[in-house]
A protein has these predicted regions:
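DNA polymerase sliding clamps and clamp-related checkpoint/processivity subunits
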Residues: 1-22, 27-130
Length: 130
């Protein structure tokens, strides 16, 4: 899986999604398929479910293999919040990998590129259907 967001406004929106999601649930499932990135989380009381579809066309680059990953939304937001406003977001994960690679890059050479590796988590919860 390899996604890229070059538009600064979209990058801010993407970070805001996880800023708000971390208040709802610590752990989220992210499912990648040919058409979309699908996010699902359930609150700690198992009362409410959050679902979000982001179409593949929303991203500047969306090269995927069908995969489901579990991430800690708090850690992911902390990483996304280190991005400078003019930096692109690139997120990669290889098949059978246990880490998510997150890169922030810019053409402006006065701003340092940043690379993070984030451990994936194994979520016991299956995909909920509504």
């Amino acid at each position: 899986m390899n996604i890229q967001i070059n538009n600064p406004i979209k990058a801010d929106i993407f970070a805001a999604i996880f800023q708000n999601m971390k208040l709802f649930s610590d752990s989220v499932n992210i499912i990648f398929d040919e058409e979309k990135m699908f996010i699902q989380a359930i609150d700690s009381g198992h009362v409410a479910i959050l679902e979000l579809n982001i179409p593949a066309t929303w991203f500047d680059k969306y090269a995927q293999t069908s995969m489901t990953i579990g991430v800690n939304s708090i850690i992911l937001f902390k990483i996304l919040s280190t991005r400078d406003k003019c930096q692109n977001i690139e997120i990669q994960c290889n098949d059978n990998a246990d880490r998510l690679l997150i890169k922030f890059c810019s053409d402006n050479k006065t701003i340092f590129d940043k690379t993070f590796e984030m451990p994936l988590i194994d979520l016991d919860a299956e995909l909920m259907t509504i």
